[in-house]
Amino acid sequence: MASQQEKKQLDERAKKGETVVPGGTGGKSFEAQQHLAEGRSRGGQTRKEQLGTEGYQQMGRKGGLSTGDKPGGEHAEEEGVEIDESKFRTKT
């Protein structure tokens, strides 16, 4: 855990707009960035649990193919990459 001095320095850097916690982008303080990072991590884990490992991997594969001008599905089609969207369904 960071000491009080380190926390204060990190908080000052965060207030200047710097991301000091991985995944804490957008937080205006050290504590806010910690909370954002924790929530984003938990959200991703929940989504993985809902979709299952295979569905989560397929969704990541599709998202990784997206570009500024084309969504991942179109790009995958052009490249001949097979994405099984049936695995995107949440488990009940």
Swiss-Prot record:
Q: What tissues is it present in? A: Present only in nearly dry and dry seeds.
Induction annotation: By abscisic acid (ABA).
**S-S bridge residues:** none
Which stretches does UniProt call biased (Basic and acidic residues)?
1-18, 37-51
Q: Looking at the UniProt record for this protein, which Gene Ontology cellular component terms does it annotate, in alphabetical order?
A: cytosol
Among InterPro entries, the record links this protein to: LEA_5, Sm_Hydphi_plant_seed_CS, Small_hydrophilic_seed_prot
PROSITE patterns named among the record's database cross-references: SMALL_HYDR_PLANT_SEED
A GO BP term here is: response to abscisic acid
Ranges for region Disordered: 1-92
As given in the record, the signal peptide range reads: none
Source superkingdom: Eukaryota
Read off the Pfam families from this record.
LEA_5 (PF00477)
Q: Which family does it belong to?
A: Belongs to the small hydrophilic plant seed protein family.
Q: What does this protein do?
A: It is thought to provide protection for the cytoplasm during the desiccation stage of embryo development.
Q: What is this protein called?
A: Em-like protein GEA6
The gene from which this protein is expressed is EM6
